[in-house]
């Protein structure tokens, strides 16, 4: 059996990935790679990380049999991997705690981050508060309007939130500004990137820290279902919750993997964020991957009701898994996600993040095509408290 062994030493996943950074940043990126490799071999680092995951974040998260949702869908048994139950309400903190510990290991005192929905910003501000690091979060001005509560949360936790008005004032622009800040303050600052994007070693580091999701799911499935699930479904923006869920399953060919992008107002419009369905390969934020771009290679706007999915690129490993057909990628519209948001709330008493609602929507359709002896695991990447106000306004506007 061939084992999956990406990325290679150059940070490539097949033809995707790599490390395309300004000369000024190269030493910092190489330092990070070395610090990470050393940390992996260091028992005390791994023990400290494990302690925080267990005692601070509240892992392991449950694998929950959603019986009423299963009944509603009719078909396969649906299970939810409850990443919404982590401290701060999403999967993001699995990565930020690991990278914050790396920051201390490198002797740096300051952290810079970007955020879209605000979840990564909150998770970064949280661990910086915990570990005594200074924290600056760049956030697009459009996202600041959509996620006022998360902005206040970050400030409450001691972070400085910087509004980004350049470009479309969303996640892509926040990443640009965070990278720019890092270039100018590289000696005392570490950039905690929030997804499996950017130059090597970021996609690998984030994937590895998030892979606790898939590892737990495998063990829990064996206990709860008696076998590995037949299908695993996760939403994909940059793609860190999905990569964390998929990575431990890649060599288990009997498990079908599904990534769900945001189709926004529809794939036939320009208003979507379905990078793999509607994009083409190109260069963004230091990596080669699928992007939403025009014929001249200019990055196009990404649109989604969910602030965490409207990134015009995708992690390079997802591009590779798409090309090799190991993962099947499809998309769900804003309307379908809104329906699933309400459906899970009404059937299970669990309000999902709008991001996760995309996966719930796809999985309920998929379940109908499967039989009751089969099983699907959905990565419920976050809770929906942050989205309730936005959904309320949207539904009232439709009446």
From Swiss-Prot:
Enzyme Commission code: 4.2.1.20
Pfam entry (one): PALP
SUPFAM superfamilies: Tryptophan synthase beta subunit-like PLP-dependent enzymes (SSF53686)
Catalytic activity: (1S,2R)-1-C-(indol-3-yl)glycerol 3-phosphate + L-serine = D-glyceraldehyde 3-phosphate + L-tryptophan + H2O
Keyword vocabulary terms for this entry: Amino-acid biosynthesis, Aromatic amino acid biosynthesis, Lyase, Pyridoxal phosphate, Tryptophan biosynthesis
Enzyme class: lyase
GO cellular component entries: cytoplasm
Domain of life: Bacteria
Cofactor entry: pyridoxal 5'-phosphate
Positions bearing N6-(pyridoxal phosphate)lysine: 92
MF GO annotations: tryptophan synthase activity
CDD domains (UniProt xref): Trp-synth_B (cd06446)
Protein family (similarity comment): Belongs to the TrpB family.
Oligomeric and partner information: Tetramer of two alpha and two beta chains.
NCBIfam families: trpB (TIGR00263)
The name this protein goes by in its record: Tryptophan synthase beta chain
Organism of derivation: Oceanobacillus iheyensis (strain DSM 14371 / CIP 107618 / JCM 11309 / KCTC 3954 / HTE831)
């Amino acid at each position: 059996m061939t084992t999956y062994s990406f990325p290679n030493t150059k940070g490539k996943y097949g033809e995707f990935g790599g490390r395309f950074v300004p000369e000024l940043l190269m030493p910092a990126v190489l330092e990070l790679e070395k610090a990470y490799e050393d940390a992996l071999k260091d028992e005390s680092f791994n023990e400290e990380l494990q302690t925080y995951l267990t005692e601070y974040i509240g892992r392991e998260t449950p694998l929950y049999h959603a019986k009423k949702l299963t009944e509603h869908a009719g078909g396969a048994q649906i299970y939810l991997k409850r990443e919404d139950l982590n401290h701060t309400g999403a999967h993001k903190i699995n990565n930020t705690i690991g990278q914050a510990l790396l920051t201390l290991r490198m002797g740096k005192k300051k952290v810079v981050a970007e955020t879209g929905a605000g979840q990564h910003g909150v998770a970064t501000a949280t661990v910086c508060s915990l570990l005594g690091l200074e924290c600056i979060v760049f956030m697009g001005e459009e996202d600041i309007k959509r996620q006022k509560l998360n902005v206040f949360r970050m400030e409450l936790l001691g972070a400085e939130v910087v509004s980004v008005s350049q470009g479309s004032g969303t996640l892509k622009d926040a990443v640009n500004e965070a990278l720019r800040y890092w270039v100018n303050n590289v000696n005392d600052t570490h950039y905690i990137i929030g997804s499996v994007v950017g130059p090597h070693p970021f996609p690998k580091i984030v994937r590895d820290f998030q892979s606790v999701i898939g590892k737990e799911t495998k063990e829990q499935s064996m206990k709860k279902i008696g076998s590995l699930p037949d299908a695993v479904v996760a939403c994909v923006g940059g793609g860190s919750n999905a990569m964390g869920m998929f990575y431990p399953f890649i060599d288990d060919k009997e498990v079908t993997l599904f990534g769900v992008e945001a189709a926004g107002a529809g794939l036939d419009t320009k208003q979507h964020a379905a990078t793999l369905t509607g994009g083409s390969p190109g260069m963004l934020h230091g990596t080669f991957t699928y992007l939403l771009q025009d014929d001249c290679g200019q990055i196009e706007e990404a649109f989604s009701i969910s602030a965490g999915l409207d990134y015009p690129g995708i992690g390079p490993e997802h591009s590779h898994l798409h090309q090799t057909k190991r993962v099947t990628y499809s998309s769900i519209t804003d309307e379908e996600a809104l329906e699933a948001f309400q459906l899970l709330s009404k059937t299970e008493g669990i309000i999902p993040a709008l991001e996760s609602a995309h996966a719930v929507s796809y999985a309920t359709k998929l379940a109908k095509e499967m039989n009751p002896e089969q099983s699907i695991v959905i990565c419920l990447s976050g809770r929906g408290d942050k989205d309730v106000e936005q959904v309320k306004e949207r539904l009232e506007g439709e009446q």
